[in-house]
Amino acid sequence: SSPLSQPAQSILITTITNDKLIVRPENIGFFKYDSERKLWRVVLNSLQHFILKHQTTAETILNYAPEFIQIHKTYIININYLYLISENSCTLLPPFNKVSELKVSKMYKKKLLDRFYDM
């Protein structure tokens, strides 16, 4: 059976203020990289967001759960919320449907499309 069919494990995320968040992957819409501050931020389905600790890398995030997929050097989404892939951006399902900033870069697009069609 595929890893997506098993009950999702909760993941432990450490914020920049050293708080520990225990979150289920299905409560996470996407991660966004703040290039200026060089920090990742997680956006939850409550639309709260938290800044992750400095040592967090894209690789760290991608290893949290199989449903996280990188779409741009500054964005990692939860593919289970993916609704639409257009030319160079993607739209997520509610409550993230108002988020219009999710850019898809050429480098990650093929992998994203492959994953999307495999669902």
Please identify what each model-predicted range represents:
Residues 111-119:
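C-terminal output/interaction extensions
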Residues 2-97:
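Conserved binding/recognition cores within well-folded domains
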